[in-house]
Structure formats: C-alpha cells, structure tokens
A protein has these predicted regions:
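Structured mid-to-C-terminal alpha-helical surface segments
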Residues: 1-46, 56-271
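Glycine-rich beta-strand-to-loop/alpha-helix junction loops that act as flexible
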Residues: 48-52
Length: 271
C-alpha cells in the first residue's frame, strides 16, 4: 500500500523537464486514469480526448498536459451526477488509500461546448495534490477507438478515446473559428503530429470536419473553409507569431507543421 502514497508516486514521476506542480498534475492524471481503467463499468462511462490522449499516444513526446479532458458517454453532468461519479471512482480498486474529492465546480460555456470544470483534490493520510478536469457530454458514439493505457502494475481495462479524424478536426477548429487571431499554438503542432503519426481516413475526416463545423454554427461548404485554412497557414506573418511562442520540444517546428497541415488539407479536399 505504501507504493500508492502520493509522495512515492511523486518521486516515481519526477523528471528534470517538469516543475513540482507539473509532477503533481502527472501523478493525479495517473491516479485518475488508473482508477477509471481498473473498473470496467467506469471505463465504459467516459471518452478521453485532448492532450492527455496525445501525451499517451506520443509516449510523452508531446510534452506536459496540465489537466484531463473527457466526455461522458452516459452520465448526468449535474453537480449531483458529478458527486456520484467521484464517489464511484473512490470505490475503484486501483490506488487504495488515495481518495478524490471535488473542491470546486465551474460551468464551461464556449461557442459549441457546454461542460463542467472540476477541481479535484487527491489525498492520502499525508499529502494532497490538485488537478483540473474538463468534462462534456459525447454527442455521437460512432468513431470511438479503444485505448489501452501504458502497462502498469495495476490490471486495467481498455478505455475509450475519440477517433483520429475527430481529434484532428478539433485541433484545426480553433484556426477556422478564430482565423489569424488564434493563439492556440499547440493545436498546430498537435495537428501536424496526428497527421504524421496516426492513420487518418480522408473520407471520415471530411465527414467529421463538416459535422463539427456545423456545431460551431459554420455552414459554408467544407472545401471553401479548408481552402481558407490553407491560405491562413501559408501566411508567413501569421506563422511568425507561432515561431515566437515555439518552445523547441515539439517534434515539428511552426513552418514545418503549417506545411504538413496544408498538404494534408489539399489532398483530403482535392484542393
């Protein structure tokens, strides 16, 4: 049981590239996903998305992600529903002696998204760490992919994550919505990594692209939007802003990432 103390897990996750706060977040992520994966009924409740999936798929190459994003497949997103979900999580067999409690709940409202941000406290008898979790509700159960966590000493069930095509569209949607004002630098690097490292069906990508943009209230033809996106990524002044924010550990630099995404869009939409 001592091996499941927060302080022991902190030392296990420690890395020169991570700050103490980032190590705590990584420990909490490991505990949260471990508890979910240790109980099949829990594993079937959620669909993982965002940076935590890319961090796992890239075996840490993507860099640190500070939270966890997921959608409920079938669970109420009310405050009462969230409390019951955390209670259920505390009954999971993984990480005995470490309990989770909700410190705060905040509504998340964006252009095409309504969800909740939970601040969770992870505690044992000696220490307490904090992690933020963003939760939405998954609209379609098609295109899900089984996701096996990295091997650990704890037996685990496969989790579910969004498909590669939807993941890529979500990374590109910030550029479609915000255009040259987009400041989500990491989305460009993530999109390039997905294209270069994961299998993408052009047909499924086009379908997901049109569907998700409609959720944003954008009803123009997908080809027209894709062409505009290619033009945006070809603007040197726009990409230059990304160069200034480039941290150096992403697998592809800003210019190369923009070229990778543009080339993919041209092929996918026959531009």
């Amino acid at each position: 049981v001592n091996s499941f103390r927060l302080s022991v897990l902190f030392r296990k996750c420690a890395s020169p590239s991570l700050s103490p706060l980032q190590i705590e977040q990584k420990v909490c992520q490991e505990i949260f996903l471990g508890k979910i994966a240790s109980e099949e009924s829990l594993a079937n409740l959620i669909v993982l998305k965002g940076g935590i999936v890319l961090d796992g798929l890239s075996k840490g190459q993507r860099g640190h992600t500070q939270d966890i994003d997921f959608d409920f497949k079938r669970w109420r997103l009310s405050d009462n529903g969230l409390t019951r979900f955390i209670q259920k999580l505390n009954l999971a067999p993984a990480y005995p002696g470490i309990s989770l409690a909700i410190s705060a709940i905040r509504d998340l409202r964006q252009r095409n998204y309504k969800g909740k941000e939970l601040t969770l406290a992870f505690s044992d008898s000696h220490d307490s760490f904090t992690l933020k979790i963003d939760i939405g509700v998954y609209r379609s159960l098609s295109g899900l992919v089984s996701y096996q966590m990295t091997p650990s000493e704890i037996p685990s069930c496969p989790l579910w994550r969004i498909g590669n095509e939807q993941m890529l569209v979500e990374k590109l949607s910030s550029f479609v919505v915000h255009g040259s004002h987009n400041t989500r630098v990491k989305d460009l690097f993530d999109a390039a990594w997905i294209i270069m490292n994961l299998k993408i069906s052009h047909q499924q990508f086009r379908s997901a692209f049109g569907r998700i943009l409609k959720e944003f209230g954008i009803f123009e033809p997908s080809e027209k939007i894709a062409k505009r996106l290619v033009l945006l990524l070809g603007q040197k002044e726009f990409i230059q802003n990304f160069v200034l924010l480039y941290k150096g550990w992403e697998p592809y630099g800003p210019l190369e990432s923009a070229e990778i995404v543009s080339a993919f869009l041209k092929v996918a939409f026959h531009l």
